[in-house]
Amino acid sequence: MMDLVAYTPRRPKSGETLRGDSFSIALGGKGFNQAIAAGRAGAQSSMLGNLGTDGFGDDFMKAFVAEGVNSSDIERSAELGTGVGHISVQTTDGDNSIIIIPQSNDLGDAQYISRHSKTIIESDILLLQLELPTSGNLAAAKLAKENAVTVVLTPAPVAALVGWEGLVDVVVPNEGEAAELTGIEGDVTKQAEALTKLLGCKNV
């Protein structure tokens, strides 16, 4: 996901045009950030996913090379552009809201995972998030579990976690995601207990 970030004192009301403070474009997306962070921490990191054949896609490929992240499994589409995230950040308190437009990310389905299964099977840890199609995520998680690969799930953007039970070793939601997934507000201990039951995992 290419992050398009608008910084503003507050969010606009419906129908309102609001003057912002600044704007930035940055390489982002949870998968990209995790792959880069893992590489910088010393892991042999590989990225699976889809990009457009546009300028944003070129920027990502250059970044993978610069960071030493294996990008040989990335497929590129001429029909669908690179996914983007429209982010609004309140400069008063840092609170943010995000709209994602997946575009080529939606090509990361079960068939894509099948074509790139070798990378998952040969890994120690598989990091997943919900910016990709459910079919692709579940196929990847099942393949990982069948081959004793640890599965770490970031459940964002929040979606119903149907079919995930027994496939996740570690789930890492933020407070808002935990509340939305469990229906429990404010009590992180109860949220963690609910998520372990929901997913059948031991680590939150």
Feature map (PLM): residue ranges:
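Cofactor-binding loop segments of dinucleotide-utilizing enzymes, especially the Rossmann-like FAD-
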Residues: 2, 49-53, 89-91, 101, ...
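Short beta-strand scaffold segments in enzyme catalytic cores
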Residues: 36, 84-88, 97, 204
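Conserved phosphate-binding/catalytic loop of the ribokinase/pfkB sugar-kinase fold
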Residues: 72, 76-77, 87-125
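Conserved phosphate/ATP/ADP-binding segment of small-molecule kinases
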Residues: 138-204
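Beta-strand->loop->alpha-helix junctions that form or flank phosphate-binding loops
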Residues: 22, 48-53, 71-82, 154-156, ...
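Glycine-rich phosphate/adenosyl-contacting loop at the front of the ribokinase-like
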Residues: 1-50, 55-69
